[in-house]
Amino acid sequence: ANTNCNLWTVPVKGGEVKCLTAENEAWDGSPVYSPDGKYIAYRMQRVPGYESDRFLLALINRLTGEKTVLTESFDNWVDDFKWSSDSKNIFFLGEDTGYQPLFKVNVKSHKINKVISNRAISEFDFDAKGNFYYTYSRTGKPNSLYTSSANGTKERQISFLNKDLEQEVDIR
């Protein structure tokens, strides 16, 4: 099976399509433009035909075409990711010792910081003030919606869809 997927651009008014990742013979996908329009962030793999290869987070500079891997030092898969509104950081989920916490990588320095720890986060987003909204579950606690401040503190549960069930049934 061929797992070589590429990123392409197509002019809105028609014209030639352009392959952006032809040199990588492994998987490239999940492209997201930066809010300032300067970059395209995407997930990539390096080993052709090896579907279990680690997913990395990479950037394409739209002006120069230069490609940069941001998560070279991160020893796990990069899952879902989102740009910060100022295009300086990318937040992403990545597995880490049995959890899936929220990380932040700086586009210039490539420094990775853990923002929300010890959580099996399945989805996340944030508002204009930088407050996070995410779902996570744990043993005995089905998926619920939580919020926290921009630095990952002041966590608060905001959905209680399974509260009655949790009180009636031991779901451990």
Regions found by a protein language model. Give the residues of each.
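Short loop/turn segments that connect beta-strands within beta-propeller blades
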Residues: P11-G15, N61-G65, N106-H110, S149-T153
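A flexible loop/linker signature enriched in serine peptidases of the S9 family
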Residues: A1-N6, C19-G29, R43-A58, V69-D79, ...
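Non-catalytic accessory segments flanking enzyme active sites
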Residues: A1, L7, I112-R172
